[in-house]
Amino acid sequence: MNKNTISNIECVITKPDRHNLITVIVETESGVTGYGCATFQQRPLAVKTMVDEYLKPLLIGKDANNIEDLWQMMMVNAYWRNGPVINNAISGVDMALWDIKAKLANMPLHQLFGGKSRDAIQVYTHATSDTMEGLYEQVDKYLEQGYQHIRCQLGFYGGVPENIQTAQNPTQGSYYDQDQYIENTVEMFKNLREKYGKQFHILHDVHERLFPNQAIQFAKQVEQYNPFFIEDILPPSQTEWLDNIRNQSSVSLALGELFNNPEEWKALIINRRVDFIRCHVSQIGGITPALKLGHFCESFGVRIAWHCPPDMTPIGAAVNTHLNVHLHNAAIQEHVEYKANTQRVFPNAAEPINGYLYASEIAGIGVEMDCEAAQDFPVEYRPHEWTQSRLPDGSIHTP
């Protein structure tokens, strides 16, 4: 195969709607350009610096064909490795290189992987409201659109605060009460099952808001409502407690969106402590490690449900879909409808049809960035208060 030299790399941040989205663009001497997602929306400038100041000079002049070698070099070149900034930066380049290779092969990405194992991937979306009436309205809307899986949240992560008794002059932050959250969420499950029966599968994201003993109690209480899965019931630092949950509840568990390092998921998969791996593809370094992780999970009966939130470019979401139609153990894909500005910046962003997402048949990933449109939505940064989650006594808790 003829050498295809990398001639330029650019990192672009744009904020068409709520989130700062990061795209890496790799140009080659063949004239083929690739696009990849590097979104770490809480630290976008750090990722851009990593790409512009470190990866770009490292990669200019290298052969874009050698994706595996370039990935390994990017990961170890700084000596320190497997952190969210470097992984997202590497991911942007890695996805772009796969995009280039698929375009040169004149194949959609999933065909380059080895073809499809399914026609389409089932999707779930988010229904969130501070009241049950508002939640019912959203569920009804999504059922009409053909969704069979809906993530239901009463209020933001941690629930709807109700007369929280804080300390005097409380420290600034986003307060919630864990006992209120458990009680209200269990009641939410009960109400949804009473109203809808088994018309759809309920998913729920705890978002690591509980202590381990509370997580055990919560899992036991919601088990009777047969959730499709409970997500992030514990933070990554407390995964040893998953055995305790497994011993007391059969509720399906999904975990992984915060993982960066293979050591964070290997034992969970080998010991079958989770039913679904929820890794964020750019957070683990892109397509190259995601394919390896998917096949590793298959050996142990663990299914794939990649993290796919709104703070991800449609390029990254399209990569998830290509992975999902290829990997036999893919279970479901998260999806939140794109707003008009995002669709303008990322033409061809896919939307579900009757509860399913279909992989693009265009050569490559199938979604690119309109660089001119992206300039209309410059990056904005402010400290996030929702990640300053606090318990009533004022102590910080994992967000």
Curated annotation (Swiss-Prot):
A Pfam short name: MR_MLE_N
Magnesium in keyword set: yes
Keyword Magnesium among record annotations: yes
Superkingdom of the source species: Bacteria
Membrane-crossing residue ranges in chain numbering: none
GO terms for MF: magnesium ion binding
SUPFAM superfamilies named among the record's database cross-references: Enolase C-terminal domain-like, Enolase N-terminal domain-like
Keywords recorded for this protein, A-Z: Magnesium, Metal-binding
One GO-annotated biological process of the protein: amino acid catabolic process
Residues binding D-arabinonate, per UniProt: 207, 257, 278, 307, 334
Binding sites annotated in the UniProt record for Mg(2+): 205, 231, 257
Family in the record: Belongs to the mandelate racemase/muconate lactonizing enzyme family. GalD subfamily.
Function: Has no detectable activity with D-mannonate and with a panel of 70 other acid sugars (in vitro), in spite of the conservation of the residues that are expected to be important for catalytic activity and cofactor binding. May have evolved a divergent function.
This protein's name: D-galactonate dehydratase family member A1Q3065
Organism: Vibrio campbellii (strain HY01)
